[in-house]
């Protein structure tokens, strides 16, 4: 699929966050702490002017590896009809470049259990035990 990755506003991410990550919940549930922080980045995969995938990067530390400069990948989502086409990989790669350009040595995220294999294929490793986010699912 031939699409462009571009920087967008937090509000633009809701077009994918809502149906993929917050389905059946109020649209306000798509707002994440840090969305409006000037150091946060929101990326969208755009195909024929439609947003089909999104990811956000936040300056946030895990509390583990405190000696490393950390950023958090969050809100990674691709519309079902575009999944499996390489869009997610493109978004993660663009987020990695952004983090690296800012001297980040650890890019981390809380992956949903059904997305773990996707991240492992990109070279990421599981750290820690699975946990439940109420109303969202197992991570």
Predicted region positions:
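A short beta-loop-alpha structural element at the N-terminal edge
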Residues: 2-14
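A conserved beta-turn-beta hairpin within the catalytic core of GNAT-like acetyltransferases
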Residues: 60-73, 83, 135-138
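Conserved active-site tyrosine of GNAT-family acetyltransferases
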Residues: 17, 119, 124
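Conserved acetyl-CoA-binding loop-helix of GNAT-fold acetyltransferases
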Residues: 78, 84-97
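Conserved GNAT acetyl-CoA-binding A-motif
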Residues: 92, 99-112
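Conserved beta-strand in the GNAT
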Residues: 44, 50-61, 72-77
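Active-site rim helix/loop that mediates acceptor-substrate recognition in acyltransferases
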Residues: 17-48, 62
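Conserved catalytic-core motifs of GNAT/GCN5-like acyltransferases
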Residues: 108-110, 125-139
């Amino acid at each position: 699929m031939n699409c462009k990755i571009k920087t967008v506003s937090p509000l633009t991410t809701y077009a994918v966050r809502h149906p993929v990550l917050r389905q059946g919940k109020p649209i306000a549930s798509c707002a994440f702490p840090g969305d409006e922080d000037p150091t946060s980045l929101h990326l969208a995969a755009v195909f024929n002017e439609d947003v089909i995938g999104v990811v956000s990067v936040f300056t946030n530390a895990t509390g583990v590896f405190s000696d490393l400069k950390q950023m958090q990948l969050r809100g990674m989502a691709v519309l079902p009809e575009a999944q499996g086409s390489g869009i997610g990989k493109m978004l993660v790669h663009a987020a990695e470049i952004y983090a690296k350009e800012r001297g980040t040595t650890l890019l981390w995220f809380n992956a949903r259990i059904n997305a773990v294999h996707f991240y492992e294929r990109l070279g990421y490793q599981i750290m820690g035990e699975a946990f439940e986010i109420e109303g969202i699912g197992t991570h």
